[in-house]
C-alpha cells in the first residue's frame, strides 16, 4: 500500500513538473526580449542625463571667460553711463565714479557679472531651452532680431502687451510654452520706464539676463550686467557675446552626443570619469571639458 500510494504522487509530480519547466523557459525567453527592448530607452535616457550633467562638473565648461576682456569692454564704451542726475539709487554699487557730470561704470564688476550671465545663457542653450531676446529700442531692432535668428532663438522688439507672459494660456492658447530665459538688451521702454516683461518675468519665475545702465533698476533682473545700453558699439558687443555663447553651447551639445553615440556607451559615471563610454583625455581637451585654471 505504501508503494501504491507513493507511485501516483511521483507520477503526478512528474506530470506537473514538465509544464512548469516549459512555462518557466517560455517566461525567460519573453522576459529577455522585453528586457532588451526596455534597456534601449533606458540607455538613451541615461546617456542624455549624463550629457546634461557633464557641464555641471566644471566652473567654465564653455570657456565664456575668453570671449571678452576689460579692454574690449572699454573700447566698446561699456563704461559710459548717464548723467549723474539720472542715476538710479540701486545702481550706485556698480558706479566707479563721475567725470564731468557723467557716471562711469566699474568695468571690473561688469566683467564679473557678464561672465556669470554668459555662463548661465550657455547652460540654458546647452539644455535646449528657449531663449527670448527683448528690447524696445527701435534703432537696435534689426540687430537684435538678426542676433536671435543667427543663433536659432527668438526676439521681441515691438510693443510688449501686458499679461503676455502671466496670461499666456488665454492669449496664446493652452499649449503655449513660455521661454526658459529672457535676455534684455534694454530694460527700459521708449519713455524710460521699466519694461513690462521685466515685471511679468519676475511674476512667472522666468530667469532674466539684462544690461542695466546707470538709470535702470537691477532688482528684478536675475543676472544684471552693468553697462552702457545706448551706444551702438556696446550693444553690438553684447549681441555678439550672447550669440557666441548660445552657438558654442549648442555645438558642444552636438559634439558630446556624437561622441557618446560613436562609443556606444551611456556615458561616464559621475563617480568614475574613466569608466567605459567616457571621453578620452584628448577628446575632453578638444571639447573643452578640462577644468579651467
Swiss-Prot record:
<protein>
    <recommendedName>
        <fullName>Small ribosomal subunit protein uS2m</fullName>
    </recommendedName>
</protein>
<feature type="region of interest" description="Disordered">
    <location>
        <begin position="21"/>
        <end position="49"/>
    </location>
</feature>
<dbReference type="GO" id="GO:0003735">
    <property type="term" value="F:structural constituent of ribosome"/>
</dbReference>
<feature type="compositionally biased region" description="Pro residues">
    <location>
        <begin position="267"/>
        <end position="279"/>
    </location>
</feature>
<comment type="subunit">
    <text>Component of the mitochondrial ribosome small subunit (28S) which comprises a 12S rRNA and about 30 distinct proteins.</text>
</comment>
<dbReference type="Pfam" id="PF00318">
    <property type="entry name" value="Ribosomal_S2"/>
</dbReference>
<comment type="similarity">
    <text>Belongs to the universal ribosomal protein uS2 family.</text>
</comment>
<keyword id="KW-0496">Mitochondrion</keyword>
<dbReference type="GO" id="GO:0061668">
    <property type="term" value="P:mitochondrial ribosome assembly"/>
</dbReference>
<dbReference type="InterPro" id="IPR023591">
    <property type="entry name" value="Ribosomal_uS2_flav_dom_sf"/>
</dbReference>
<comment type="function">
    <text>Required for mitoribosome formation and stability, and mitochondrial translation.</text>
</comment>
<dbReference type="InterPro" id="IPR005706">
    <property type="entry name" value="Ribosomal_uS2_bac/mit/plastid"/>
</dbReference>
<dbReference type="GO" id="GO:0005743">
    <property type="term" value="C:mitochondrial inner membrane"/>
</dbReference>
<feature type="compositionally biased region" description="Basic and acidic residues">
    <location>
        <begin position="39"/>
        <end position="49"/>
    </location>
</feature>
<keyword id="KW-0687">Ribonucleoprotein</keyword>
<dbReference type="InterPro" id="IPR018130">
    <property type="entry name" value="Ribosomal_uS2_CS"/>
</dbReference>
<dbReference type="GO" id="GO:0005763">
    <property type="term" value="C:mitochondrial small ribosomal subunit"/>
</dbReference>
<dbReference type="GO" id="GO:0032543">
    <property type="term" value="P:mitochondrial translation"/>
</dbReference>
<feature type="region of interest" description="Disordered">
    <location>
        <begin position="263"/>
        <end position="293"/>
    </location>
</feature>
<feature type="compositionally biased region" description="Low complexity">
    <location>
        <begin position="21"/>
        <end position="38"/>
    </location>
</feature>
<keyword id="KW-0689">Ribosomal protein</keyword>
<dbReference type="InterPro" id="IPR001865">
    <property type="entry name" value="Ribosomal_uS2"/>
</dbReference>
Amino acid at each position: 500500500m505504501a508503494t501504491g500510494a507513493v507511485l501516483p504522487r511521483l507520477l503526478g509530480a512528474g506530470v506537473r513538473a514538465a509544464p512548469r519547466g516549459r512555462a518557466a523557459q517560455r517566461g525567460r525567453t519573453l522576459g529577455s526580449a522585453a528586457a532588451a527592448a526596455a534597456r534601449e530607452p533606458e540607455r538613451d535616457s541615461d546617456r542624455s542625463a549624463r550629457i546634461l550633467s557633464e557641464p555641471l562638473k566644471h566652473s567654465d565648461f564653455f570657456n565664456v571667460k575668453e570671449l571678452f576682456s576689460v579692454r574690449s569692454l572699454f573700447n566698446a564704451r561699456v563704461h559710459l553711463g548717464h548723467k549723474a542726475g539720472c542715476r538710479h539709487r540701486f545702481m550706485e554699487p556698480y558706479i566707479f565714479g563721475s567725470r564731468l557730470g557723467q557716471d562711469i561704470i566699474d568695468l571690473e564688476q561688469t566683467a564679473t557679472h557678464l561672465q556669470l550671465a554668459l555662463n548661465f545663457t550657455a547652460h540654458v542653450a546647452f539644455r535646449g531651452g528657449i531663449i527670448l531676446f527683448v528690447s524696445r529700442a527701435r534703432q537696435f531692432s534689426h540687430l537684435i532680431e538678426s542676433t536671435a535668428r543667427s543663433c536659432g532663438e527668438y526676439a521681441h522688439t515691438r510693443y510688449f502687451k501686458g499679461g503676455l507672459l502671466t496670461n499666456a494660456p488665454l492669449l496664446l492658447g493652452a499649449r503655449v510654452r513660455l521661454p526658459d530665459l529672457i535676455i534684455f538688451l534694454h530694460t527700459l521702454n521708449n519713455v524710460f520706464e521699466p519694461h513690462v516683461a521685466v515685471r511679468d518675468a519676475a511674476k512667472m519665475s522666468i530667469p532674466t539676463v539684462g544690461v542695466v545702465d546707470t538709470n535702470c533698476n537691477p532688482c528684478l533682473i536675475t543676472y544684471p550686467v552693468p553697462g552702457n545700453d545706448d551706444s551702438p558699439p556696446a550693444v553690438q558687443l553684447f549681441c555678439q557675446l550672447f550669440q557666441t555663447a548660445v552657438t558654442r553651447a549648442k555645438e558642444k551639445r552636438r559634439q558630446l552626443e556624437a561622441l557618446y553615440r560613436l562609443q556606444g556607451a551611456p556615458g561616464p559615471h559621475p563617480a568614475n570619469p574613466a569608466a567605459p563610454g567616457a571621453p578620452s583625455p584628448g577628446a575632453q581637451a578638444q571639447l573643452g571639458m578640462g577644468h579651467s585654471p
